[in-house]
């Protein structure tokens, strides 16, 4: 049994070439059972969304393009996506529009949901241009400390921090809490 994963990519006035890199990386995932919902929210300018709509068509049936107007910022867009999520989905994965995943992302992390007590899996992250300068290398070192030490300690105490991107959530758990909280401008601060 390979769980169906619905990947949600919210975007607000994101540069098309940046979002295109994200979507192309998602098209190369080595996981057979997923969809990608691209949620362009509150962005009326065609410059931002028209090339992405075309790219989603080119990438095939796994990619669903939506251009919506909603309230609640990113969380509102993610909640709207829940209405379009494939009924087979067991896991929701969220990736920001400017992230690039490696092909084994899902195949490596989805098995963690075999434990029915697992509701959230937070993947570590780095800056893709972390080797371009000392400042960016330092930012990656900061991330490494957070993920390699802090998150491991939190996991042992069942007190994980959701970063808002590179996160996977069991859909039934998400629905149990009523979706993403829209009371704050950033959905991962609640």
Positions of predicted regions on the chain:
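Short, acidic, metal-binding catalytic loop of nucleotide-sugar glycosyltransferases
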Residues: 23-33
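A conserved acidic beta->alpha catalytic loop
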Residues: 32, 40-52, 69-71
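N-proximal low-complexity "stem/linker" segments adjacent to membrane-targeting elements
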Residues: 1-24
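Hydrophobic/aromatic residues located in beta-strands of well-ordered beta-sheets
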Residues: 7, 36-38, 120
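Long helical/loop segments within the catalytic core of UDP-sugar-dependent glycosyltransferases
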Residues: 56-60, 65-90, 103-185
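Cell-envelope/extracellular polymer assembly enzymes that use nucleotide-activated donors
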Residues: 4-6, 35, 190
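Phosphate/oxyanion-binding active-site loops and adjacent basic polyanion-contact surfaces
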Residues: 15-19, 48, 70-78
């Amino acid at each position: 049994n390979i769980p169906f994963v619905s990947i949600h990519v919210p975007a607000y006035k994101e540069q098309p070439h940046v979002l295109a890199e994200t979507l192309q990386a998602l098209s190369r995932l080595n996981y057979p059972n997923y969809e990608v919902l691209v949620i362009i929210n509150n962005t009326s300018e065609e410059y931002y969304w028209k090339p992405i709509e075309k790219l989603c068509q080119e990438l095939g049936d796994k990619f669903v393009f939506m251009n919506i107007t909603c309230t609640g910022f990113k969380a509102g867009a993610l909640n709207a996506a829940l209405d379009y999520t494939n009924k087979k989905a067991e896991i929701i994965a969220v990736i920001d529009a400017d992230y690039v995943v490696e092909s084994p992302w899902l195949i490596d992390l989805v098995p963690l949901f075999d434990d029915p007590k697992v509701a959230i899996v937070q993947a570590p992250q780095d800056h893709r241009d972390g080797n371009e300068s000392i400042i960016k290398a330092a930012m990656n070192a900061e991330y490494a400390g957070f993920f390699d030490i802090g998150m491991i300690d939190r996991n042992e105490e069942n007190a994980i921090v959701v970063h808002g991107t590179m996160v996977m959530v069991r859909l039934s758990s998400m629905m149990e809490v009523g979706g993403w909280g829209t009371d704050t401008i950033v959905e991962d601060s609640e």
